[in-house]
Amino acid sequence: MTDYENTDNAATSATSSVSGATKSNEFTTWEDVDELNPQLLRGIYAYNFEKPSHIQQRSILPIMRGHDVIAQAQSGTGKTGAFGVATLQVIDLDPKKTDVQALVMAPTRELAKQIRDVITNLGTQMAGLKVQLLVGGTSTDDDAKMLKAEMPQIVVGCPGRVFDMIRRRNINARNIKLLVLDEADEMLSSGFKDQIYNIFQHLGNNVQVCLFSATMPQELHVLSEKFMRDPVKILVHAEQLTLEGICQYHIALEDDDGKFATLQDLFKTISMSQCIIYCNSVKRVSDLTEAMVLKGYPACCIHSGMDKDARDDAYDNFKAGKYRVLISSDVTARGIDIQQVSTVINFDLPKSVHTYLHRIGRSGRWGRKGTGISFVTRRDLRQLKEIEIYYNTTICELPSSFIH
């Protein structure tokens, strides 16, 4: 195993380990990649990917060259761009190729939709490119008809709907040559494990498999041993994940009763472009949203109890700037990339150290400075300490003079 220091890139300050890769599998500028499709290169620059991020520099070439890949990087470092560029490079746009060639799966509708948008935007210069979204909450018959009519090279979706299309033989899984799992740890822990394993059983023996995630629990290593062949491993050790560029603070409270008043005081004190507030339950999200709206704050919400159209409308309106505040359960904690989000507030401290990383990572996207503020009651003190130990960081109390 070879270690490389990340002194050349500010996206992360952690040490990475690259196993199974050599220096020839890395690059520093897009022009270094001689085999890159010129149409794709134009799309990359049009999407403002001027310089490849750390994870892109180390993962794109191994994928392009046919290796299985396990890639771990903290949130906001360009994982979607990494597998998006690689996927667009490996597909064949020959109109005679009518089967789905690449399958990208994510744990939530919102993340799948965003991945579809990124891949589509990166490939705007690639004539004949077709990317289809497969998620729950839409008509399965319409999805099947579109698969038949459009014959997309790339499908992006959630495991449930994807497996349904495979089971119905609307997708010929045997001819898929690349499978990408984004936020794979979340999919394995949130009820998708059986569906993912079922999908693997339908794939051909030579399918290329790539796993991307901010965390790599043991279950992912078990999956890799079952379905991957000598994968290139690009890992950031968990204890070294530092959330570079994000200022982290906590506000100490006696109990939950003082949270809403504290939140109002916070909004009077700090200025922010856009803000995401996380709660630990659907009811908390609904109650807080109602209270914020009654106080005149431009707030909307997303939680798992909403139907697809309502969630999409809220997300699109927030992204467009119609609302400055998004109140959410953990359904948006992974992969949602809105560059205007400068502040994340944990109204409830997350119960998982991994979720803390994903939530706070919604701020400070693509090298921008961000702020994460957590409300911490007396009963949360042990969890706060666990987070600090796990990420080898200190989350200081927000100073009374803080102005953001």
For each predicted feature, which ranges?
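Conserved helicase RecA-like core
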Residues: T2-A10, V18-H404
